[in-house]
Each structure stands twice: as C-alpha cells, then as structure tokens.
Amino acid sequence: MPNLVLVVNVTVNPKHTEALKPAMLENAANSVKEDGCLQFDVIQSQDDENTLLFYEVYTDADALASHRETPHFLKYWNMMQELGDGVKRTAQLHDLIS
C-alpha cells in the first residue's frame, strides 16, 4: 500500500498570518515525531505570504487519523476554527507513487 499524502492549501486573512504561523510550525515540528508521519512541510507562497501549503506524508490512513487526535494538531485546529472566515482551507489526499 502506498504512503498517504495530504496537501492542504491555507489562505489566511493578512491580519492573522503572523499569529497563525507559530501554531502551524509547532504542529509540523511535533508531527514529524509521530510514528506514522514521514514528512510534514509548511510552505509559504513567494507570490502571496498569506497563502501557505502543508505537504504531509503518512504511512497510512490510520497514521493520519492518529495525527488528528494529537494535542499539537488540536491546538492548531482550534486556532483555525477560532479565526472562522479569516482562514480558508482546502485539502486533498493523494497516494505517493514515487
């Protein structure tokens, strides 16, 4: 079974970007310590500093589900929820084939 890739595109209201970035980076740093998380990158657009991308690689769907229950993810997720319309998020799941 191929590894699971989650690509998340986040567009943040400019007034929230600097406040949200530390939570994103903390989530990423702690996520790669999880057994089933192989990679977690936070990428910022060169064209728009308020557009960020998460590139996450997990061993399988169970590892992703476990990730979503961790304290660091929940801290990030709750912050995103509090911002409401100040954050737009889309996510896509992929199979890693290379």
Mark where each language-model region is.
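Glycine-rich beta-strand-turn "strand-cap" elements at beta-sheet edges
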Residues: 2-5, 42-48, 78-98
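N-terminal first-folded block
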Residues: 4-33
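Short, well-ordered beta-strand segments in beta-rich or mixed alpha/beta enzyme
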Residues: 4-11, 41-68
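Short flexible/disordered coil segments
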Residues: 8-9, 70-74, 96-98
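Short phosphate-engaging motifs
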Residues: 16, 50, 72
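Short, glycine- and small/hydrophobic-rich beta-strand elements in well-ordered beta-sheets
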Residues: 29-52, 94
